[in-house]
Amino acid sequence: MNVEIIGQKFEQATRLLCEYMPLAETLIKPTLFHCIRVGVYLYHHNYSLDLIIAGIMHDALEDTDISEGLLEKEFGLNVLRIVKANSVDETITDFWENKRELISRCIKNGEDSMIVKACDIFDSFNYYSKLKSQKDLDFCIGISKIIFNKLPENFSDEIFKTLKNKLSEYS
């Protein structure tokens, strides 16, 4: 993929996210910063344009007023599919059951959806370790364990090894 096109789409996604992102104090973490870091990680590790954009937009349906229709119009059905797989089902009220269902949905959607989720959790691990927030690190540990309990053997992308190594630092 042409670097110029990636740059244009990256900026388009970032601008859209900025336009719809609520004020930082209404969110549990600096979500915009997190979403950009996930996209940058995917870019620096030579993932496809759709994965880079899905990484930037992975929290858009949960944390902004961006609609599925707008996401599809701007970035296509594949990006929407990955973002939807990475979005919590608000009808499931049990916290950990919600996370197990989300991971199962990502797996069912395919390795690309799990790559974005693994990158999301890897970034959260790094962020919360810098904050020394044990509660948030415990969340990262818990969801990583769910990932590795469910991850199919044929999902072999490097991000899974990277996340497993990060998990081993805390287990």
Task: Outline where the language-model segments fall.
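Active-site helical microenvironments for divalent-metal-assisted chemistry
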Residues: M1-S171
